[in-house]
């Protein structure tokens, strides 16, 4: 198969979406046997960031450098022309991944939805962000394949977007090899509990902060606000150095930081929410994310059960590989053609 894969999110500082896109691309390349084309309009600066991300990957690049790249991507889908074939020649599959919805004349049409949080909680987001997610939802209804990152999101997409179950494919994210117990550890002289939770309402760091005085520990709480913007390459060090990892999120499509922390050998405290069941499995202490008292008790429990939770977490994390993510994509394309 000749597969055109939208990599435009990799032209920005890396996020969970970008990590998934790069991981799935690497997984498909590792599985082998098919032609992969990285495509999309990007800015001059974005092109440099994207080239860094794709360095060393044997993938054909069809990248168009344009000013106002984000606006260009949105306009391309809104205008419905020119067709993607003009830039890509022929292809069997066109897979778009984020805000860009390119028109096409032929071939299988596939997309990815990471979660439907913006449609569940529109009052928590800027109207423009909600509008963009609504557009993505409309496209999902007309795509041949809709990839999701969990069974939870699959059910959400089927119910809320009325997408037929036979067009939805679950492709779990993988864990990069750099997330492992051995390696450098963050250490500033004070033992700590780590969280990636931010001020975003869904991430729920406010309730975690309210819980912290109740933990009654000499440990300190380390959040992204305490260490500044966390570059992707620093995450393994922060996980490894932690006495425990807390993920008090109110809603997720999957919850990859939980698996990353487990892969680094850290006991985890995770919200008791269906969206995190698949990420945490039975290898974490589950907790009501709205109760500071429950969160404090769960942190104390995770610290006390470290010898039990760490091996369970390591075993659970080994289930998630980018090679398997890539194989699911390729098999899904082949089955649908």
Which positions does each model-derived feature cover?
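Carbohydrate transferase catalytic cores enriched for Leloir-type hexosyltransferases
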Residues: 1-337
């Amino acid at each position: 198969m000749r597969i055109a894969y939208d990599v435009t999110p990799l032209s920005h500082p890396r996020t969970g979406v970008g990590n998934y896109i790069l991981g799935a691309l690497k997984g498909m390349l590792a599985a082998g046997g098919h032609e992969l084309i990285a495509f999309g309009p990007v800015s001059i600066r974005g092109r440099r960031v994207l080239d860094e991300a794709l360095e060393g990957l044997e993938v054909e690049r069809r990248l168009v450098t344009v000013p106002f790249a984000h606006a260009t991507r949105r306009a391309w889908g809104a205008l419905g022309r020119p067709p993607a074939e003009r830039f890509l020649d022929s292809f069997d599959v066109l897979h778009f991944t984020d805000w860009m919805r390119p028109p096409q004349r032929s071939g299988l049409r596939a997309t990815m939805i990471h979660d439907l949080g913006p449609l569940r909680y529109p009052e928590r987001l800027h109207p423009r962000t909600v509008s963009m997610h609504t557009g993505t939802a409309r496209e999902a209804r007309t795509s041949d394949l809709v990839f999701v990152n969990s069974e939870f999101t699959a059910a959400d997409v089927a119910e809320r977007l009325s997408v037929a179950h036979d067009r939805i494919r679950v492709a779990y994210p993988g864990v990069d090899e750099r997330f492992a117990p051995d390696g450098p550890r963050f250490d500033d002289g004070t033992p700590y509990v780590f969280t990636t939770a931010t001020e975003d309402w869904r991430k729920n760091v406010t309730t975690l902060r309210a819980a912290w005085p109740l933990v009654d520990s000499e440990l300190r709480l380390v959040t992204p606000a305490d260490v500044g913007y966390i570059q992707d390459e620093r995450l393994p060090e922060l996980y490894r150095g932690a006495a425990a990892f807390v993920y008090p999120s109110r809603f997720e499509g999957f919850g990859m930081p939980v698996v990353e922390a487990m892969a680094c050998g850290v006991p985890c405290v995770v919200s008791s929410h269906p969206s995190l069941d698949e990420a945490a499995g039975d290898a974490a202490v589950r907790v009501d994310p709205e109760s500071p008292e429950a969160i404090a008790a769960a942190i104390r429990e995770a610290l006390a059960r470290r010898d039990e939770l760490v091996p369970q977490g390591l075993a659970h994390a080994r289930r998630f590989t980018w090679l398997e993510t890539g194989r699911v994509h390729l098999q899904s394309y082949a089955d649908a053609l």
